[in-house]
Amino acid sequence: MNQSLRFDKKDRDLLVKINEVIDSGNVSSAEQETFRTSLHPHGIQNMVSTHEERMAMAEVNLLQRLNDGTGVEARLSALKTLHEEVLYSAQTPFRFNTSRVLIQLMKEIVRARGNEEEQLRLIHDFQKVAAGNPRIVRAFLSKFFLLEMPEEWNQKTMDDHVHDANTMGRKNSTYLVMDARVKGIRRLTVVYYNFVDSKVVYELYEAAHIMGISVRLGIKFKARFHDRYVEFLWTPKGFTDTKSVLDFLKEPETEALMQEGRAVEDWAREEVLQTLEAFNAKHAAEISKEWGIEVPLLSEKEFDDYVGMGQTTLIRLSEFVHSQLLPLVEAEAEKVKQELLCASAEDQGVLQERLKKLDELTSVVLY
């Protein structure tokens, strides 16, 4: 009864549709038709679905494609649909800031899967914000620690050193650009190590064009200088569009440089894999002895699956090892907590120290 009073049927119907997409990873064929980029948000789509519903489904559709390994064109198409829905169909002069809050709210809705009460609350907030009332939007900007940006989108905001999933980051290029828009960043420099793939550059620049963000390409190299390694960042300039960047990467001199960079990355990958072998041969037993957990041998294939399209680095290796050990550590910690319930005062001190020791086994320690 209480839930019925707090959330209306529209909230619950939208929750069902969103969770169907989250669980299946796909939007129904009928709903997919409303995401066709050839259809204007103010056109025939208004006859088959509401503005709020289309925005919600466009956002969850994109978020699912960002994480399911979908191809570049599918991600870019989903991003374009989202951009058109939250910007061009908005009946408010506060549309840029409204779109930023709506995207953040949908991310929270997806994260809250499994907690129906929290999802319904967020969906109710989503539908309130979708109306574009400046007072409500400003309240949610503050809640999510987002600065209000001018609706002319002419602010001087930048981030001159970020990484996507192809290097040290966790987000593919489309996701990175979408998050930059939410944060109000207008200029972005995305850094890669030693080389960059033309497919990655295509996605990055096309996504930036869709979202109205100025993006620059940076490639970090290492070189020897006075018997030491120094790092320097190369940021080529003078590009007018995606095609001009891709043409530059196809130039013989640039291709030769990229091939050398690939060779460096291949060498670095082999070094990391040798470290994985050393972990299995030596360090796993040491961790088992020190922390009292049975550490399994880790396979190269599992590590490759964990890294995905990202860079094979020692930091990624330490994070992978930690992800494999975490369930074992949690199980051991739960066992110690149960022992604490019936332990003597003297034993409780020992068990508390054991819990503290288990809590110290982080990816930073492993690194």
Predicted regions mapped to residue ranges:
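Aromatic- and acidic-residue-enriched segments that line the glycan-binding/catalytic groove
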Residues: 228-238, 315-322
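An N-terminally biased module of ancient metal coordination in phosphate/nucleic-acid-related enzymes
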Residues: 1-229, 236-242, 249, 350-367
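Non-catalytic, alpha-helical, charged scaffold/linker segments
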Residues: 27, 244-367
